[in-house]
């Protein structure tokens, strides 16, 4: 009996020792210089920059799903537009005197040129390969109808001619000419309808998911880079030396937790970035809240449709709709196949990610951001009405919207696709309590040890300049050093300069990136004469007709 008891005791001690060793291993700390949270294009872009700027730095990327680029960066979850303001009318708002402001359009275009240079450099460095797998020439068009909208497009076209970045843009109000540019848009249209269009040949369709996969695949070839999939962030702890200990769970291994100690943490988790930023406890996070809006598209893969449309055609947002909600009918090249998408139609879910939780919105609401959210809701009732009307749309109503851009569309050629979630930024404001912010914001602590990217637009197309801005903010001294300056100018030749206003530099950059990326580019030859716009000063808006706040879909 004593022998049996002794044996059982020995086994118990042994099992306990094994258990303790397993727990010790589970809580063992992994160390890394840079921790990238989220396997999307932002983390992949930042990681690629840092790998070239500081090749000795160790990096770890964690992603909750079982592969990278499966959320917002996925080609099917976004519109795939290389946003350069060539056709997006919301980037050129009308001023009080009736003229058109182009400042935002110039900024957006400059930013996209940085992305083009970044991608071209990665192709030349062997990081990206087969450019046609991720970027293709697809002309960008604006198309409008009705006297007021035609007059606006005239004014927009005239104003954009003042910028060197928009040289080569064509303009027409002729049905036959526009039909040559976009047959589907014009066939079956009333020949008496007053229409106008602009067209820029150098527009692009971009598969941001493919770019992300290729960037991460290249990073994985480096011995000091680690990718951990099926890994969810569970907590943050700031250490005395200003580093961070981040607790993560292995979702494929019984949610076993382990810790990663990092000198710098980037939260590039799309819609989940806000909640993770809040969990860090940094005071800067208290200024922000988020409101999720989803998007749906009608998709056609019918060759009769696909082969007769090669353009991205953006219209004008209807009265009472946010400017960014502008409908568009787009050629997309996804996984080597051409398709046509029309939309977006706004949807609502409390999830912050397509693969998120229905509790996301509630769990991100805190005592510090609740009132700003209430203030935004009360101050933007027209936006709330718009979202409700979108959610209530029937299939027939969506199809009628499509027929405004494709009069001879057949219902059987189209199916509805749910794209990704876009979390809009709500920021605390001293005067209004809270404001809805269109765009992206880099939020970091004062020491530059942790940073998050919030917001949704223009998003992926400006990943390269956004991550440049982030590095200028958190690695200020490094960016100012001669070593980093030289490398950054190798990656982005125009870094530190403006292309706008310099015809020679603009043409040189477009020619270089087009050659490397396999894109179409012909130097501009002629300027179309457009009828002179009638500038109509805006009547002082009444409170009931306040402009609808903008959101990204």
Swiss-Prot record:
Record HAMAP family: MQO
The family this protein is said to belong to: Belongs to the MQO family.
Gene3D superfamilies listed in its UniProt record: D-Amino Acid Oxidase, subunit A, domain 2, FAD/NAD(P)-binding domain
Cofactor: FAD
Chain positions covered by the region annotation Disordered: 534-553
The species this protein was found in: Citrobacter koseri (strain ATCC BAA-895 / CDC 4225-83 / SGSC4696)
Pathway in which this enzyme or protein is active: Carbohydrate metabolism; tricarboxylic acid cycle; oxaloacetate from (S)-malate (quinone route): step 1/1
Protein name: Probable malate:quinone oxidoreductase
InterPro entries: FAD/NAD-bd_sf, MQO
